[in-house]
């Protein structure tokens, strides 16, 4: 496994992208080496390889996202090898299918990711366009696994910090989803997983604060759009009235002639 790990880590990666995420990468690697977190070390290498060449809507290399998700968990006191490894790989099944022709089984058979990490990655993987019932099933499955729950909340927190890249409609859906499901499962975790109370509390509070801020902004925007729309409609109505008045005057003038 060490040979495979080194093979992945020594690949040629985009130099400019590497400069952007190198500090986060080395921070996590240092923590993992000091604590002998073998799954995390493997996950670092695999996630870097899988996300190479991918970028988020804000232009940053995609690999920076799982690094931030993992770093956040570390900063909140999490040192569990399974949790940190899963946080680094949480998007690979969803976003790296072209590099996983066997549907992700390669993570187990080729790279040495263990079954517990793989199970969390599967729980995190979500199809697009789910309705409320399907979303409730998805989030309920996550909340039953405390380690998956931590990864999901850290993922949501980082995504909530880059909502400015979302379209207005997508942003409103995201805010609603956070209110209906994310805050609920975070509260569930605080009640049922006392070993992670501190991390869950911080994650929940930060997500809630960001979500409320974005909700206020969208409500202000919607109100401004509504006011502008009403103003335009009033002006259009007035223009129509003036045109009718003008036509009436013209007709009256013709009659007089």
PLM regions: where:
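Active-site helical microenvironments for divalent-metal-assisted chemistry
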Residues: 2-255
């Amino acid at each position: 496994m060490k040979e495979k790990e080194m093979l992945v880590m020594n690949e040629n990666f985009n130099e400019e992208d590497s400069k952007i995420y190198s500090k986060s990468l080395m921070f996590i690697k240092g923590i993992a080496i000091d604590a002998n977190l073998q799954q995390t070390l493997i996950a670092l290498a695999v996630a870097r390889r899988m996300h190479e060449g991918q970028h988020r809507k804000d232009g940053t290399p995609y690999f920076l996202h799982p690094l931030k998700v993992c770093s956040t968990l570390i900063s909140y006191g999490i040192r569990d090898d399974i949790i940190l490894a899963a946080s680094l790989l949480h998007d690979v099944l969803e976003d790296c299918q072209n590099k996983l022709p066997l549907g992700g089984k390669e993570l187990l058979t080729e790279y040495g990711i263990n079954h517990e990490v793989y199970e969390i990655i599967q729980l995190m993987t979500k199809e697009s366009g789910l309705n409320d019932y399907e979303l409730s099933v998805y989030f309920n499955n996550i909340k039953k696994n405390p380690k998956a729950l931590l990864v999901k909340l850290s993922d949501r927190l980082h995504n909530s910090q880059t909502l400015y890249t979302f379209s207005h409609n997508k942003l409103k859906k995201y805010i609603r989803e956070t209110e209906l499901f994310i805050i609920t499962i975070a509260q569930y975790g605080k009640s049922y997983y006392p070993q992670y109370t501190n991390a869950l509390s911080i994650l929940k509070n930060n997500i809630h604060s960001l979500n409320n801020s974005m909700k206020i902004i969208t409500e202000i925007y919607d109100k401004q759009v509504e006011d502008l729309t009403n103003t335009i409609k009033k002006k259009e109505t007035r223009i129509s009235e003036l045109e009718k008045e003008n036509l009436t005057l013209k007709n009256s003038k013709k009659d007089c002639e």
